[in-house]
UniProtKB/Swiss-Prot annotation:
L-ornithine binds at N156, D220, S224, M225. Disulfide bonds: none annotated. This is Ornithine carbamoyltransferase. Keywords: Amino-acid biosynthesis, Arginine biosynthesis, Cytoplasm, Transferase. It comes from Methanosphaera stadtmanae (strain ATCC 43021 / DSM 3091 / JCM 11832 / MCB-3). It is found in: Cytoplasm. Reversibly catalyzes the transfer of the carbamoyl group from carbamoyl phosphate (CP) to the N(epsilon) atom of ornithine (ORN) to produce L-citrulline.
Length: 302
């Protein structure tokens, strides 16, 4: 794997990367494959977890991170992505980019000669999902016979999680209102891959039905960056899809709750559930560091 834009790029390497993440977290793996390497971090969208975890992780692996806001680059003044890619490939050893459009990252990959890692696009968020899988593995031991329910908007996180669940053999249900389903092509691909791992992928509009026998409940904000003009309508439509104690009680007794953050407490999840004993949210957030270090390690150790 040279680049990571989609979970599909890591289809055959998911478990290997998770093993590296566990080893880095425990301290068993101490090698620093980024020594004397410079990693550019381009941000077209604001970030807390992605920026801090990558910056710290690059340092811990021996490298030097360079924060590059899109407004500080000539991209902001109309320089073609092709030209930017060719030039940055001469200066840097790798790029992590948090972009507004997935197509822009694909173009960056096309003209770069160095590894490109997506820190989020409007289509997928693979780095987040590696942290999620690491968290589920830590809490549940393995993925077989486990059921995760993603509740809310079928967004970029949901898209990547569908593919990941199919690859590792975990059952996944997306509980969402009609019209807010995940990407159709990704959903179809995930269902095809799930057949190979004897897992099930499905969409359920009835959230109460969806959470039955769930091992993991997962949610994200109802209004993503760029959807602010739909805020009132989305809040009305998604209101029945809130993770609260009542909904949580319908899942397994030992079910855990996950959220990729930032959260709007009182909307997609209640404050008491976020800090409850069943919340894995803070371990999940910490695991962004270990998962992203593992991705970098895997790419640059090859």
């Amino acid at each position: 794997m040279k680049n990571l834009l989609s979970m599909s790029d890591a289809k055959n390497e998911v478990n290997a990367i998770l093993e590296i993440a566990s080893g880095l977290k425990s301290g068993e793996i101490t090698e620093k494959p980024l020594t004397n390497k410079y990693i550019g971090m381009i941000f077209e969208k604001s970030s807390t977890r992605t920026r801090v975890s990558f910056e710290v992780g690059i340092h811990q692996l021996g490298g030097t991170p360079l924060y590059l806001s899109s407004k500080d680059l000539q991209l902001n003044r109309g320089e073609p992505i092709e030209d930017t890619a060719r030039v940055l490939s001469r200066f840097l050893d790798g790029i992590m980019i948090r972009a507004k459009k997935h197509e822009n990252v694909e173009e960056l990959v096309q003209y770069s000669t160095i590894p490109i890692i997506s820190g989020l696009t409007d289509k997928e968020h693979p780095c987040q999902i590696f942290a999620d899988l690491l968290t589920i593995k830590e809490y549940k031991g393995d993925f077989n016979d486990k059921k995760i329910v993603f509740i809310g908007d079928g967004n970029n996180v949901c898209n990547s999680l569908l593919l990941a669940a199919a690859y590792v053999g975990m059952d996944m249900t997306v509980a969402c209102p009609e019209g807010y389903e995940p990407n159709e092509k990704i959903y179809t691909l995930a269902k095809q891959e799930a057949q190979k791992t004897n897992s099930t992928i499905k969409i359920e509009n009835n959230v109460n039905e969806a959470v039955k026998d769930a091992d993991v409940l997962y949610t994200d904000v109802w209004v993503s960056m760029g959807d602010e003009d739909e805020q009132d309508e989305r809040e009305r439509i998604f209101k029945p899809y809130q993770i609260n104690n009542e909904l949580l009680s319908q899942a397994k007794d030992d079910a855990i709750v996950m959220h990729c953050l930032p959260a709007i407490r009182g909307q997609e999840i209640t404050a008491d559930v976020m800090v409850s004993p069943q919340s894995a949210i803070w371990d999940q957030a910490e695991n962004r560091l270990h998962a992203q270090k593992a991705i970098l390690y895997h790419i640059f150790k090859e």
